[in-house]
C-alpha cells in the first residue's frame, strides 16, 4: 500500500480538507464563457467531496449539449453534476425556478455539513443566490408571449429598453428568451423586473471566485472552442433540434444556435458562420464581464495560470479555515484590469 495515501485514497501529504469543521457555506466559480469554469469546478468538487451545482441558464435544458458547452458524459461520470440537463426544451425555465431549486439543494448540502460549489456564467442565476434577489415568481403567460412574439426581435428589445433600461442593460440584444421573459414580467406585474428584485442576502458565508483573462486571449479561447464545437457536430445538433421542435423554439434563437439556424436556411454563407459566432460570443463575454465586475466580493484568478487548480484550492481552504476560526472571509483580491 502507498504510504502516502490514506485508506480512502486521499494523498496524506495534502493538507486535510477543512470541510468537516468549517461552517458550511457556498463556493462560487463564475466568469465569462470559455474560461474553463466547469473544469476547475469539477476538480475542486472532487477534491472537497462537495456537491457541484450548475448555474448556466442553457445547460439546464436537455438535448442542448454541444452549443451550450455542457460537461460531457465522461466528465459527468467523474462526479455528479446537479441542476443540469433536466428541463424540457419547450419549457421556459425561469430564474425563480432555478433559485428555488438551487436554494433547496444548498440547504440539503448544509444539513450534511457540506459546502457546495456553484459554477456558471449566468450572472442573474448566480446573483439570485449570492445576493438573495427577490425574483418575481411569474409563471409563463402563453397568450401574452404569443402576442409579444409577433413583434420583430429588435422592436421587443427596444421596447424593453424603454420600459426597464436596467434589465435591458443586463440582457444581450440577441437574447430573445430573456428579453421576452423581462417583458412578460413587466406586463404581468405592472412593474419592471429590476424593481421587483429586492435582495435578501443568505445567512451563510460565500466565497466568490471569478476566472478571467485579457480579451485578446479570451477571444483566442472562444475561437478555438467554437471550432471544436463545430467539429464535434454542433450543426448536426441544431438540425436535429429544429426537426424535433421546429425552428421557432425560443432556445434555438439563442447565441450560436440562431446563427447556425440562419446558415441552414441559407441566410449566412458557410465561410461567415464561424467568424460570426466568435464575434457575437466575444460581445457576450464582454457583457458577462461587465456583470461580474459589478458583483461585490469577487476574487479574480487568471484562467490560464498553470497552477490555477492549486490557486483555487488555497483560496478555498484559507476561506474555510477563516469560517472555523473567526467566522469572517478573507480579504477580497484586486479586480482584473480593464480590457482594451
Swiss-Prot record:
Gene3D superfamilies membership: 1.10.20.140, P-loop containing nucleotide triphosphate hydrolases (3.40.50.300)
Residues that bind ATP: 31-38
UniProt-listed GO biological process terms: tRNA modification
Pfam assignment, any one: IPPT
Statement: the UniProt record of this protein carries the keyword ATP-binding: yes
Domain of life of the native organism: Bacteria
Positions of the UniProt region annotated as Disordered: 1-25
Named cofactor requirement(s): Mg(2+)
InterPro entries referenced in this protein's UniProt entry, alphabetically: Dimethylallyltransferase, IPT, P-loop_NTPase
Binding residues annotated for substrate, in chain numbering: 33-38
Keywords for the protein's UniProt record, in alphabetical order: ATP-binding, Magnesium, Nucleotide-binding, Transferase, tRNA processing
EC identifiers of the protein: 2.5.1.75
Site (Interaction with substrate tRNA): 122
Record's function text: Catalyzes the transfer of a dimethylallyl group onto the adenine at position 37 in tRNAs that read codons beginning with uridine, leading to the formation of N6-(dimethylallyl)adenosine (i(6)A).
NCBIfam families registered for this protein in UniProt: miaA
Oligomeric form and interacting partners: Monomer.
Protein name (Swiss-Prot/TrEMBL): tRNA dimethylallyltransferase
Origin species: Synechococcus sp. (strain JA-3-3Ab)
Amino acid at each position: 500500500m502507498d504510504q502516502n495515501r490514506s485508506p480512502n485514497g486521499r494523498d496524506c501529504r495534502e493538507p486535510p480538507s477543512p470541510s468537516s469543521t468549517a461552517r458550511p457555506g457556498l463556493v462560487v466559480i463564475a466568469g465569462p464563457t470559455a474560461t474553463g469554469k466547469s473544469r476547475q469546478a469539477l476538480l475542486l468538487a472532487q477534491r472537497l467531496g462537495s456537491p457541484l451545482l450548475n448555474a448556466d441558464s442553457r445547460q439546464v435544458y436537455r438535448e442542448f449539449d454541444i452549443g451550450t458547452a455542457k460537461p460531457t458524459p465522461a466528465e459527468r461520470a467523474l462526479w455528479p453534476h446537479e441542476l443540469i440537463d433536466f428541463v424540457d426544451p419547450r419549457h421556459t425555465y425561469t430564474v425563480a425556478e432555478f433559485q428555488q431549486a438551487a436554494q433547496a439543494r444548498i440547504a440539503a448540502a448544509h444539513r450534511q455539513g457540506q459546502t457546495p460549489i456553484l459554477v456558471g456564467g449566468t450572472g442573474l442565476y448566480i446573483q439570485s443566490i449570492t445576493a438573495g434577489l427577490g425574483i418575481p415568481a411569474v409563471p409563463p403567460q402563453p397568450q401574452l408571449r404569443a402576442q409579444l412574439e409577433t413583434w420583430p426581435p429588435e422592436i421587443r428589445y427596444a421596447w424593453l429598453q424603454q420600459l426597464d433600461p436596467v434589465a435591458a442593460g443586463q440582457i444581450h440584444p440577441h437574447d430573445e428568451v430573456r428579453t421576452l421573459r423581462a417583458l412578460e414580467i413587466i406586463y404581468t406585474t405592472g412593474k419592471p423586473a429590476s424593481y421587483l428584485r429586492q435582495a435578501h442576502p443568505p445567512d451563510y458565508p460565500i466565497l466568490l471566485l471569478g476566472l478571467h483573462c485579457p480579451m485578446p486571449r479570451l477571444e483566442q479561447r472562444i475561437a478555438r472552442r467554437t471550432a471544436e464545437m463545430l467539429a464535434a457536430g454542433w450543426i448536426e445538433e441544431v438540425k436535429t433540434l429544429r426537426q424535433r421542435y421546429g425552428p421557432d423554439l425560443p432556445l434555438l434563437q439563442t447565441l450560436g444556435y440562431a446563427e447556425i439556424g440562419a446558415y441552414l436556411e441559407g441566410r449566412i454563407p458557410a465561410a461567415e458562420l464561424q467568424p460570426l459566432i466568435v464575434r457575437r460570443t466575444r460581445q457576450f463575454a464582454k457583457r458577462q464581464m461587465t456583470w461580474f465586475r459589478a458583483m461585490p466580493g469577487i476574487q479574480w484568478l487568471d484562467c490560464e495560470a498553470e497552477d490555477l487548480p492549486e490557486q483555487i484550492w488555497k483560496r478555498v481552504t484559507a476561506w474555510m479555515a477563516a469560517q472555523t476560526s473567526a467566522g469572517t472571509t478573507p480579504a477580497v483580491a484586486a479586480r482584473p484590469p480593464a480590457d482594451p
